[in-house]
């Protein structure tokens, strides 16, 4: 027998860690690392794992789910009997005399010792407590979907900030080259002006262009700092060190589909949450309807009622009773009817909200698809524009080499090339971020896998 007990205990110790690991893995699935691996960026994956471990919003969402689980246990407790011990000890001082009909009891002083064990149980004839527990379970489903929505929002927001940081960094490096070139142009134009070969307007225009580029650089540095600060908060880091990120030239991102079935919205947490809320509201209506019915409570107590310490557990002090107590609120001033109507209207609101969420979900998916198509088309045009500018600059270099144009013309052509590169960088990152927007719109599923569509 002892061997069997030891075997059972050991098996429990083996099973419990596995169960705990499953819970962790289930939460880690909310991050959906398989999707983020489509970007082929180990730095991003590492940041996502740090988010999972440290982000405070994710922890708060997890705690809300745990609260909902405890509410289920609270509702389940109402389906079980209640037991309590309500003992008392008192010293009784009676008046001069106590009259019971013809019997007169003179004044006296005595101890009263009462040691009862009380129990009660509400008979769930109408299933009200059972429905309350089902309602609590629906609330847990809502909390779980809200937690999943938080994961999708936080990871998508971080990824968007991450690639915006990549964009700002690439734009900043490219703009540094533009500013260096523009400073050289200003210096050469100033020499031409001093030599009487250029008007003052030409020099002022070049200086004005340089000032504009320097203002753009200040804006980029500000945006870079703001993005870095926001990402530090998301990662729950205490330092303001620069967030590590990949380079622009190594970017990879998934291909987006041309169209998606409307059934893809079934994965969205807001839709699942609104569906669970509508079901919960329906259960609450049924619960409120049962408030009109009587309740039946079984009760009883078992214990001792003695007057002397040395006779507490004597046979004659034993006390026990049991019974059933029907309870029916005949008039409450319309409170129960008002509560029923409130829950009924809440149910109707929940149904309307669910139908609205369906339409909103379809709209957001379609909007995200339009965004991906638009950014892809803009990227194609940006690439085409950049290629044309490359050809123009190559032509400008050939003209300079054969003496058909000045060095200033060749440098201005190079500036235009880098300016076009700026637009190309922005269009590329916009296309990357549109893939993240689509991921968010479809409910955090990997849309690159056909089985999810």
Predicted regions: what they are:
Residues 59, 82-109, 120-149, 272, ...:
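Small/polar (Gly/Ser/Thr/Ala-rich) solvent-exposed segments
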Residues 9-17:
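Bacterial N-terminal signal peptides
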Residues 19-71, 249-279, 330, 358, ...:
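Bacterial Sec-pathway N-terminal export signals of envelope proteins
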Residues 47, 113-119, 260, 320-324:
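Hydrophobic, lipid-facing positions within transmembrane beta-strands of outer-membrane proteins
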Residues 73-74, 118-120, 287, 325:
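Outer-membrane beta-barrel architecture
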């Amino acid at each position: 027998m002892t061997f069997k007990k030891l075997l059972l205990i050991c098996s429990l110790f083996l099973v419990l860690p596995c169960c705990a690991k499953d819970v962790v893995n289930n939460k880690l699935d909310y991050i959906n690392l398989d999707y983020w691996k489509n970007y082929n960026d180990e730095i991003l994956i590492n940041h996502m794992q740090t988010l999972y471990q440290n982000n405070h919003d994710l922890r708060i969402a997890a705690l809300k789910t745990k609260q909902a689980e405890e509410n289920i246990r609270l509702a389940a407790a109402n389906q079980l009997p209640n037991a309590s011990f309500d003992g008392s000890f008192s010293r009784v001082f009676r008046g001069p005399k106590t009259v019971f009909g013809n019997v007169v009891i003179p004044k006296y002083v005595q101890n009263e010792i009462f040691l009862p064990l009380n129990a009660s149980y509400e008979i769930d004839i109408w299933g009200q407590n059972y429905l309350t527990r089902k309602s609590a379970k629906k609330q847990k489903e809502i909390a779980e979907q809200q937690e999943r929505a938080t994961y999708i929002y936080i990871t998508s927001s971080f990824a968007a900030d991450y690639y915006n940081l990549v964009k700002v960094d690439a734009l900043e490096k490219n703009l540094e080259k533009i500013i260096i070139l523009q400073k050289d142009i200003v210096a050469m134009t100033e020499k031409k002006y001093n030599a009487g070969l250029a008007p003052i307007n030409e020099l002022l225009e070049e200086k004005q262009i340089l000032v504009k580029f320097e203002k753009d650089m200040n804006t980029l540095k500000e945006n870079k700092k703001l993005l870095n600060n926001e990402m530090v908060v998301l990662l729950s880091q205490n330092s303001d060190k620069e967030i590590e990120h990949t380079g622009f030239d190594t970017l990879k991102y998934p291909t987006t589909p041309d169209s998606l079935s409307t059934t893809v919205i079934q994965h969205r947490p807001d839709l699942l949450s609104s569906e669970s809320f509508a079901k919960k509201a329906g259960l609450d209506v049924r619960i409120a309807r049962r408030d009109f019915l009587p309740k039946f409570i079984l009760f009883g107590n078992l214990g001792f009622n003695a007057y002397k310490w040395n006779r507490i557990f004597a046979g004659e002090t034993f006390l026990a009773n049991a019974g059933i107590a029907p309870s029916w609120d005949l008039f409450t001033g319309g409170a129960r009817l008002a509560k029923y109507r409130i829950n009924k209207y809440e149910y109707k609101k929940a149904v309307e909200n669910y139908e609205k969420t369906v339409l909103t979900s379809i709209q957001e998916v379609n909007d995200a698809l339009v965004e991906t198509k638009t950014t892809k088309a803009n990227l194609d045009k940006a690439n085409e524009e950049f290629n044309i500018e490359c050809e123009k600059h190559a032509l400008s270099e050939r003209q300079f080499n054969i003496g058909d144009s000045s060095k200033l013309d060749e440098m201005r052509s190079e500036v235009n090339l880098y300016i076009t590169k700026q637009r190309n960088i922005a269009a590329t990152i916009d296309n990357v971020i549109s893939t993240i927007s689509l991921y968010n719109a479809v409910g955090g599923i990997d849309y690159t896998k056909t089985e999810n569509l």
